[in-house]
Amino acid sequence: MAEPDRLVRVGAVDCGTNSIRLLVADIDRATGALTDVLRRMEIVRLGYGVDRTGRIDPDAMRRTLAMSREYAGQCASLGAEGVRFAATSASRDAANAAEFVAGVRDAFARFGTVPEVITGDE
């Protein structure tokens, strides 16, 4: 077992077209070894209707941002020092993607998280 001061607790959120996943883990600074503390996955259907309308559906955005706030609270209560948030297709392609990104920034403001909207290749 690593010495406690060698560990850093972090969170990572993967927000896709249909689900949003959370990983909170301890990383050993010396070895890079990762130990899961919490894993969650919820279906939010963020991409519902985006192909048809070109926009994130208001209910889908509300569901996803509510789960983002819940995940941020869990990261805080578990002592995460930072959180990385990566979002994919729906948040990249939608006309109202900026509204979604602003909501995520607000949800994770205590961590200074800037959501990363990754390319299709990433």
Features from the language model and the residues they span:
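Nucleotide/phosphate-binding catalytic cleft detector across ATP-hydrolyzing
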Residues: 1-15, 23-122
